[in-house]
């Protein structure tokens, strides 16, 4: 087994006024040669967008982009005809492929939006861009792994599909609950809330651990916790 630990305080940080962003991996002005990626996971940003602010229209190409709201709602528009709102409990997937443009905006006059954005390197380049989003019921992840995203050729249940052999799961853990996660590739465990013990490493809010070369990973919740698991090829 090999593991890498990323404490919350070790992340890059940028304060643009309208946007406060924590970067797990090198992104924009935050550049760290030892924090470029975890396998095919290239970006994990923890963003807070202020009321009535947002990301103007900008392009992407050949990247799988997954957004997961933690609080608040974002209005989405893109160049392939989608105009949607994405809220807590939903997951959004964009496969940028040959290229698309999009914007994300916080329409609220009062509340900030906190969301996670993940970029995963695609398996096949220059595919036709596509977009999807879905509501995932919280009860389906209570003390069990709920698969949010899976490969388009090996889709799991009602999960959203991406152009990569990657899986993204979420679990809401009760205090004291123990569970094992079966690795498909390498897995990056990002703790959204709470406190957990993973392979003898104590993780608190926004801490993370990446694990490879192991079949099962053992998890125990020291507090009620919300855990995101990003399982991706390492090469």
Can you say where each PLM-predicted feature lies in the sequence?
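Jelly-roll (double-stranded beta-helix
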Residues: 1-235
